[in-house]
C-alpha cells in the first residue's frame, strides 16, 4: 500500500494520530521537501516519528518514482507531504503511476494553506482562483497571474497568493557544468511579493491601464500558519512592503473588497499599528 | 486559553497529535455537532480521547457561549470542530467574543472538505466560490446559488457544493408549542442534490433561458471523504441522480469544463461503469 500522508503546517505534532501510526509501521518513509517546509527540520520529524526519513526531491519523484514504488505491492510505503497531499500542490501523478502498477493507495489528509488561510477571518468560500507569485529575475518578470487577481476582485473574491520557494536550485553555471552544487534555499517574503505587485501596478499605470489593485488595497500577510509563532498582519498593499513577519513560509491574500462585517472584525484583530506603517520606508 | 481544534474528516484518529494532547489536558471539552458529522459518534471520540465531551449545539454556541468561556482565562477549554475550525463554517464569532473577554485563543488546524476535496484529482486552485444546496420544501425552493455555479463555470472554475444537514431540527408544530422534540437528523445525498439541480436546469429551459449546466455536465460525487469507506464517483449530472454512494456526508462537485489532462486522468479512476448508469432509472 502506498500511503500519501499530509503533515499539516506547523511542527512534528501536526501529523494526525492515524498518520503517525502508519508512519511508524511502514517499511520505507519518504519526505517530499521541495514544495513546502515545516518550521522544524527533517531531524525533528525523525526524532518524533522514531523513523528515518528518505528525502524525496523533485528529481526523485519525477524521474525515479520506481524507487518509491519498489515492493509497495507487498509492503507499506509512506510518502509524507507538508500540508495536505492535494493542497497547494497535487500529487496525483504519484497516484496515477501507482494505480498503473497495481499498487493500492490511501490518502491521510491534513490542513494545508488552502484551508488554514481561513484563520485570518476571511471566509474560504469567498476565495477565487489561487495564484503563485514567482521570484523575478533581471530578465524574467512575469505578470500574467495579475489577470486572475483582477478577475477574482471583479467577482468580489479574495485571492490567495502562494509565494515562491527555491529549494535545491543550481546556478546556471553549475547546471551547465553538471555540478550538483545547490544554491542556499530561498523563500519569498510578503515584503518581496508586495513590492513586485506594486511594480505591476505601476507598469499598468505607465501603459495607461487602470490597475485592478492599488497601494491602498487591503491585503493580509501570513507567516508560519499553524506554527506556534504564526503571524498575521492586515493592512494596505503599501504596508505589506515593510511589515515584519519573520521567518518563512509566507503567504499573501489580496482581499476582494466588500468584506462581510465578520471578516472586517476578524481582520481588525490583525491590523498593523499606525506607528509601524512607515517602517523601513 | 480557548483552543479551537479541527478533528479532520474521518474518525477519532484523524485528530492531530497536538490536538489530542490538548484535548487530554483541557478542563472542559466541547464538541460542535451541528455543521458536520464524523463517521463515528460522540461515544467513539470519548473513548479514544479518554475524555467526556460536552455537545455544543447551535443554541449553546450562539446564545450561551458564556458557558464555554467560563474560567477560560485561568484554565484551558477546548472546542472541537469536525474538519477545520475555519473550513466550510467559520467559527470566527467565538474568537471575536473570546478576544473581547480577554481570553487568548489558539487554533489547531486539520483537513476540511474545502481542501480534502482535492482527493478526487480536481486541482484546488481551479475551484471558484463554494455553494450550499439546501433541502427544498413544498414552498421554499431557492435557486439563487445557481448564479454562482454559472459564474464559476464561465470562468472555467469548479464548484464545490456543500449539501444540507438538518440536525436537531424541530417540526413546526413542536417549535410553536415550545416542545424540545427533535426530528431525526437528515443529510442531503448526492442523488437528491443532483435531482434538485436538474429541476433548476428544467426551470431555466421553461423560462427560455440557456442553463449553465445540463444533464451531461461532468460532476463528481464524494461520500465520507477521509473515512475508510470513502467513495468518489465521476460522471454526468444525470448519473449523479442514481449513483450509489452510501451513508453521509456527501458533497458534489460541478466541474468547470476544460479539465487539465491530469484532472481527467484522475477522474477516470472514479468513473461510473456504463452498466450502473441506468440504475434505478
Curated annotation (Swiss-Prot), chains A, B:
One annotated Gene Ontology cellular component of this protein: cytosol
Name of this protein: Diphthine methyl ester synthase
Catalytic activity: 2-[(3S)-amino-3-carboxypropyl]-L-histidyl-[translation elongation factor 2] + 4 S-adenosyl-L-methionine = diphthine methyl ester-[translation elongation factor 2] + 4 S-adenosyl-L-homocysteine + 3 H(+)
Biological process terms in GO annotation: methylation; protein histidyl modification to diphthamide
PANTHER family listed in its UniProt record: DIPHTHINE METHYL ESTER SYNTHASE, DIPHTHINE SYNTHASE
Enzyme Commission number, as recorded: 2.1.1.314
Sites where the protein binds S-adenosyl-L-methionine: 9, 84, 87, 112-113, 163, 225, 250
Family affiliation: Belongs to the diphthine synthase family.
Functional description taken from the UniProt entry: S-adenosyl-L-methionine-dependent methyltransferase that catalyzes four methylations of the modified target histidine residue in translation elongation factor 2 (EF-2), to form an intermediate called diphthine methyl ester. The four successive methylation reactions represent the second step of diphthamide biosynthesis.
Pfam family, one: TP_methylase
GO molecular function, one term: diphthine synthase activity
Protein keywords: Methyltransferase, Phosphoprotein, S-adenosyl-L-methionine, Transferase
Pathway: Protein modification; peptidyl-diphthamide biosynthesis
Enzyme class: transferase
Protein source organism: Mus musculus
Residues bearing PTM Phosphoserine: 171
Residue pairs linked by disulfide bridges in the UniProt entry: none
